[in-house]
Amino acid sequence: MNKPVLVSFLVSGDPNPDATLKFMKALDKYSGVIELGIPFSDPVADGPTIQAADVRALSNGFKIAKSFEVLKEFRKESDTPVILMTYYNPVFKRGIETFVMQAKEAGANGLIIVDLPLQEATEYREICKKHEMGTVFLAAPNTPEERLKISDEASTEFLYLISTFGITGARESFEQMTFDFIKRARTTCKGKICVGFGISKGSHAESLIEQGADGVIVGSAFVDIIKNYGDSEEALVKLEELAKELSEGIEKGYEKRNK
């Protein structure tokens, strides 16, 4: 991840596992990383768009093993890094080491456990290190300097900067607070920083990359397309179109940053 990248998020199994595989392939062309969300019944960090996607997947009988199967199929055609996003409960129930080993075997490059605080993640980090599984932790605009440093050190893939307070979901524009946070993280952190929450168009990506981000994470905007078009050719076209627009925005932001 040398040049800034698009990190594209999908909910695994929404509306069905076969569709997820097709959607991953459609986004692959313009994505530097794919983030695959494992549906959970109580996704507290997610807004209504992704919560509804979780419900759609779970109501179709989704099981965690299906996420691993989809990823294995994707790995037959692509080596684009894939980060699995989940909550702690499903990992704990399966057993941390079992989950990490199964994710690794399926072809995952890293994990995000959204509701696992860094101070409680010692065992998890040790297991990930043992199995060469990447880790991603989150930081918010009010994260103190020292915690930002520790979160950066604990994140082997990238640090996930939450652009604003609250839950995920598309918004019109970003406040100065977000840009200030990127600049602060840029000076504090040694690793890669990617910004998520609320990004839905090329102009968003452009402004965030221009401020110094190494990547933008886009979820709700893609999931909205899937909600509206379902498992269809039109969904594939719309997903690829949006990924292209975002990718072009990233490129423009990178050019501006390097002028």
UniProtKB/Swiss-Prot annotation:
SUPFAM superfamilies per the UniProt record, alphabetical: Ribulose-phoshate binding barrel
Keywords (A to Z) from UniProt: Amino-acid biosynthesis, Aromatic amino acid biosynthesis, Lyase, Tryptophan biosynthesis
Any one cellular-component term (Gene Ontology): cytosol
Pfam families named in the record: Trp_syntA
Catalytic residues of the enzyme: 35, 46
Pathway noted in the entry: Amino-acid biosynthesis; L-tryptophan biosynthesis; L-tryptophan from chorismate: step 5/5
The enzyme's E.C. designation: 4.2.1.20
Catalytic activity: (1S,2R)-1-C-(indol-3-yl)glycerol 3-phosphate + L-serine = D-glyceraldehyde 3-phosphate + L-tryptophan + H2O
A single MF term (Gene Ontology): tryptophan synthase activity
InterPro entries xref list: Aldolase_TIM, RibuloseP-bd_barrel, Trp_synthase_alpha_AS, Trp_synthase_suA
Coiled-coil segments on the chain, per record: none
Keyword DNA damage: no
HAMAP family documented for this protein: Trp_synth_alpha (MF_00131)
PANTHER family cross-referenced by the UniProt entry: TRYPTOPHAN SYNTHASE ALPHA CHAIN, CHLOROPLASTIC, TRYPTOPHAN SYNTHASE, ALPHA CHAIN
Family, similarity comment: Belongs to the TrpA family.
Role of this protein: The alpha subunit is responsible for the aldol cleavage of indoleglycerol phosphate to indole and glyceraldehyde 3-phosphate.
Assembly description: Tetramer of two alpha and two beta chains.
Protein name: Tryptophan synthase alpha chain
Originating species: Methanococcus maripaludis (strain C7 / ATCC BAA-1331)
